[in-house]
Amino acid sequence: MLLVDIGNSRVKWAQYDRGQLGVQSASAYSGWTIDEWRRALFQSPGVDHVIVASVAGDAIAALVSEAARLETGKPAAFIATSREAGGVRNAYPEPRLLGVDRWLAATAGNRLARGACCVADVGTAATLDGVTDDGQHLGGFIVPGPELMMRSLWGGTSDLASRT
């Protein structure tokens, strides 16, 4: 099985077999064609199905799903945010509005902490989510990550760029 995490600007992937996570890889993916997705994700033999968590949108999802179909005979399976998973209850009235990346991080954080946790993730965006001891997702926030924040500050200020 191939596990794939597609963020806003980078993709991370690893094979998972009999409880063991294989070699992990990552790359920026801007503008990749279906052939580039196939070359990147299917370097190792033996992938029989693909599971994807993606915040990259429908066009990227379609490319990855088709790449999976061409390589395995089956389209990729995409994880969706739900009302409840792994003992964690989603705080959002409309679960799909919480990014799957944040949802998976909150459920994994709760499982790893065996209770209350606060999960931070920093990439293109920076996110923070909390989960109570009894598994209630408290919500959180998303803000620009460091690079986007600096570009915003440099573009919106006259003197900051010369001092950084």
Predicted regions and their residues:
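N-terminal glycine/serine-rich phosphate-binding loop of ATP-dependent small-molecule kinases
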Residues: 1-85
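Gly/Thr-rich phosphate-binding beta-strand-loop-beta motif of the actin/hexokinase/Hsp70
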Residues: 1-22, 109, 115-137, 153
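Fold-independent oxyanion-binding glycine-rich loops
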Residues: 6, 54-55, 81-82, 101, ...
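Conserved active-site and cofactor/substrate-binding residues in soluble primary-metabolism enzymes
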Residues: 32, 59, 97-104, 144, ...
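Flexible, glycine/proline-enriched loop segments at strand-loop-helix junctions
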Residues: 54, 92-97, 137-141
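Acidic-glycine-rich active-site phosphate/pyrophosphate-binding loop
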Residues: 74-86, 124, 158-164
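Conserved phosphate-binding catalytic cores of ATP/NTP-utilizing and phosphoryl-transfer enzymes
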Residues: 84-117
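Glycine-rich phosphate-binding loop plus the immediately following alpha-helix
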Residues: 111-114, 138-164
